[in-house]
């Protein structure tokens, strides 16, 4: 389906490196939530785009610049991992610098994997970064089991995190996004969650990599490359975020870019032309803000 739509007008972290030496910090208290506003430029034609649902927002104040079916409940596929990452960073008692306990169940996950093995020695923060780069379902389960003890407990924490970030109609049942009855979100909720995360420097750092070398302590390091062609395309200002695909969800993408100090986020759900649509929609958004 092709859509052409009219416009809809309407965290700073204390020094903590994304490594095994990272210090535990209270990320929620460190978030700078002061919105940045910018006057929208009128009379700019919206681009033609595709997909079942879409929303384009100004990440600094959550202003919706363009949307289509943005509140429709849909399968999010691996865009779920944005919530998994945010929950891992915000959950009380999480020690990101400690070695993860990797169970046989986590290591058995398919089909997109980081490649961890049961008993591997690698810090939790590096599992999180590897998850975002490789879209590893195994890494997502490792995070869930280490942060909350079980997938059901972590899913409850994910839903708390989503609400904290401004989501109003989402229900997450697993950390990886594989299809499960009752696991759903909306494009608008994903945009709000991503925008909340992008106010946290550590989150921003972990969602922007083209590749990452996993520093296993018990075997040779392994390098994984991003599944996100939007990041690899070097779109001007591109700095995240996450891909997703399952047969039920179709092709999904959360893409973010920052120009002139302004960050925009576009969410595309079930969009076979996501790599073409994301740059066009972001270009439109920056023009709306008077940024080229």
Model-inferred region functions:
Residues 1, 93-95, 273, 285-286:
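Alpha-helix capping and helix-coil boundary motifs
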Residues 168, 179-292:
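Domain-terminus/edge residues, biased toward the C-terminal soluble/receptor-binding domains
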Residues 3, 9-18, 22-188, 192-201, ...:
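Active-site-adjacent loops and short helices of periplasmic peptidoglycan-processing enzymes
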């Amino acid at each position: 389906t092709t859509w052409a739509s009219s416009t809809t007008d309407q965290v700073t972290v204390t020094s903590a490196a994304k490594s095994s030496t990272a210090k535990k910090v209270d990320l929620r208290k460190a978030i700078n939530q002061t919105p940045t506003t910018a006057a929208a430029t009128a009379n700019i034609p919206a681009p033609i785009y595709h997909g079942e649902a879409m929303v384009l927002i100004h990440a600094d104040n959550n202003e919706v610049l363009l949307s289509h079916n943005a509140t429709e409940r849909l399968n999010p596929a691996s865009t779920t991992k944005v919530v998994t990452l945010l929950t891992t960073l915000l959950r009380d008692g999480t020690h990101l610098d400690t070695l993860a306990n990797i169970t046989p169940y986590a290591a058995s996950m398919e089909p997109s994997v980081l490649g961890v093995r049961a008993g591997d020695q690698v810090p939790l923060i590096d599992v999180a970064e590897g998850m975002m780069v490789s879209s590893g379902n195994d890494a997502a389960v490792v995070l869930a089991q280490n942060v909350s003890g079980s997938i059901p407990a972590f899913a409850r924490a994910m839903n708390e995190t989503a609400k904290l970030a401004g989501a109003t109609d989402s229900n997450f049942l697993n950390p990886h996004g594989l299809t499960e009855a009752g696991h759903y979100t909306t494009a608008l909720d994903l945009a709000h969650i991503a925008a909340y995360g992008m106010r946290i420097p550590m989150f921003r750092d972990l969602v922007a990599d083209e590749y990452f070398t996993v520093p296993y302590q018990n075997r040779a390091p392994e390098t994984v490359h991003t599944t996100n062609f939007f990041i690899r395309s070097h779109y001007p200002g591109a700095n995240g975020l996450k891909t997703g695909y399952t047969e039920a969800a179709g092709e999904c993408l959360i893409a973010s870019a920052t120009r002139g100090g302004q960050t925009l986020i576009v969410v595309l759900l079930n969009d076979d032309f996501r790599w073409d649509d994301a740059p066009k929609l972001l270009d439109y958004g920056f023009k709306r803000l008077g940024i080229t």
